[in-house]
């Protein structure tokens, strides 16, 4: 007889290597074929809903690690909720209008000006849908479970129709108006931009000090006195209409080299050196309020520049007197309106000067900086020029500088319902908590929202104009356009004449001849995605508004969180979300932003081909995603190592329950040994902790909890000593079935707990466990937290034992290093104990030699009896010696009774009994 044939070695079809890049697509094909998403919805029908509303990614370009981070977090949440008693449908979406798509079409050599807008828009739509298809394939390969056959896409007619309704409702409430005021203008995009489309970058600019000569001093200043201004935008001097001083600041008139100059008193010390005023004497001091309506002359145009009082003039920098061009700045505009100045903005859409700026016609504004400075020097008005580096607004798409430019635009008035917006922010639950402050401050401080864009690819502003110029936005026109868009798509606006867009027989007092025109601007793309609560949550039967959760990157406080809140509060009076969760950005291993120029980009598609989607997903679960996160080949290698440990744990558990039938072989809790109960209690604690962490969206905690459980409780303890039972004992012995009961419970529990994070691997485990015809793991519910008898008492005892076991392990390691023993199985452990430790061991049931994975064990009372050579700690002393006896050929334990059965001279008594009883014919 070959004794090795009497060992019950692990057997499983679950392979050691995951081979994820090849296996995952097979599972995905199976899920699609079996309509798993639909089955999950059917299973959860009638349960309370949990709606995570997908913020739409922009349909342009390859998926990056930020996409993978975002979509995986969402998928983990939705999968968790779907296994936790909720109906949690997930409808993915895409944002498909806007400049990047126009730019992409232009890069293909398409000449926009040589075709109709409608034709150009068709090309944009085709391109966007191709991008959607490419990204959809990428998201599905990542294992994201959702309604991929019916996503929401902002260019679809039914979406645009609902967006028009949102606009109409806001107009009806008086929140939409047309006005001329300075807005962020991007010459590179030839369009107005909203605050959300601005990012700040360092820029080097010319900083100039300019003298404006007084022509009417109002009895306060002498004629010919110079008021000194400072600006970092010399190109705006041609648009200067005034100078602003603070009414509550003191200003000094100084005399230097026969000329008089006015500056803020507080700034004089710094200006003496900068402007060469070292020897200047102070002639008089005046309050800013006394300078109100003093008249100066523009340095090189024949027009006045009025001195005005304004709070925004400060003594923090410059001269305390602010150059004011009402067409090129918000503060300038507001004070210009107050003083009835002309709102002059002499630039065209491309940032080129018009004839309203004589001497600079046809010159790009940035190029004009040098020309303006030279002109000021020529007329003797330039006191100083230097270069400074400062933070300056840029177009977040083109990365080029933007300017403030007064143009006629359509706005959504925020002032009209700002208090409601702020109250709504307070009513939402924010994670991280600082999100509330961030959005609250943004809403509190933001100006009105410029919603018009001078572009082609977007949803048209549904506005008509009467013959007298009056804008027409009525229930009748809005409903008609909404239905036209629903039937034909928004391109109909550009394909049809005005008369064919208006309701039949439409009349308006402003058009006695029945003539009308239509608006040519489109809506800000943030209005598109910001209307999704109406076009998706409110429109789809399986969804509802408000959503339970909006979850996006932290850049969306100024973006989607903000625009969605604005439109929702405007039309419904409440926020579109109950909870908002935000994540940071994916950076490289050194914490740098990923970019092609740095060559540090890591694409999820490439990682999935090499390692598999479950590794990307496990990386997402491993990071503290609420801050910026790092990813690199090295980091993914570490994650892969944790995956390997989890997989090996599953394989060991599966392999050792191959002959276990849970229906007939399960040992009831009360009949388990205490150490088995201890493991089930630990497993139950894991269930509670993991479910709490899922609920709090703390996935990195789950990653560590499960990794620790697999490594510490299972691999290093229970599974390790279990081999002496499950391999060695008779198949149906009580102790073996008890341990298999724990193994079975552990593999079922771990598989369910990990299913939201590792959907492919857990499906593979589940199929191996249940066998042919197994219903998907993703149709199961998470395990319940159980009430287990005496759990506190058992935990306290065995936790204390585990601490002592750690000391024994250290002593064994020391003995191995000192060559006192070879393998631990050759050792005898003598444990010297006092007090509490003695009481503990008296109360424990178990084969301690087996638990310590040694051949012999002796407990001795009295620490004082321990020899000098013993390994000592605070409670115990451990003496390691070589076990007496011979090694049993079957169980490899050193026993004194080897050969007790003469028929089996190389076996210990235990093994001989098992062989005689179960394997001898």
Curated annotation (Swiss-Prot):
A motif ('KMSKS' region) lies at residues 593-597. This is Isoleucine--tRNA ligase. IleRS has two distinct active sites: one for aminoacylation and one for editing. The misactivated valine is translocated from the active site to the editing site, which sterically excludes the correctly activated isoleucine. The single editing site contains two valyl binding pockets, one specific for each substrate (Val-AMP or Val-tRNA(Ile)). Belongs to the class-I aminoacyl-tRNA synthetase family. IleS type 1 subfamily. Its EC number is 6.1.1.5. SUPFAM superfamilies: Anticodon-binding domain of a subclass of class I aminoacyl-tRNA synthetases (SSF47323), Nucleotidylyl transferase (SSF52374), ValRS/IleRS/LeuRS editing domain (SSF50677). L-isoleucyl-5'-AMP binds at residue 552. It is an enzyme of class 6 (ligase). It holds the Pfam family Anticodon_1. Catalyzes the attachment of isoleucine to tRNA(Ile). As IleRS can inadvertently accommodate and process structurally similar amino acids such as valine, to avoid such errors it has two additional distinct tRNA(Ile)-dependent editing activities. One activity is designated as 'pretransfer' editing and involves the hydrolysis of activated Val-AMP. The other activity is designated 'posttransfer' editing and involves deacylation of mischarged Val-tRNA(Ile). Its cofactor is Zn(2+). Its main location: cytoplasm. The gene is ileS. Monomer. Binds 1 zinc ion per subunit. PROSITE patterns: AA_TRNA_LIGASE_I. It is found in: Cytoplasm. GO terms for molecular function: aminoacyl-tRNA deacylase activity; ATP binding; isoleucine-tRNA ligase activity; tRNA binding; zinc ion binding. Coiled coil: none annotated. Zn(2+) binds at residues 888, 891, 908, 911. GO terms for cellular component: cytosol. It catalyses: tRNA(Ile) + L-isoleucine + ATP = L-isoleucyl-tRNA(Ile) + AMP + diphosphate. ATP binds at residue 596. A motif ('HIGH' region) lies at residues 57-67. One of its GO terms (biological process) is isoleucyl-tRNA aminoacylation.
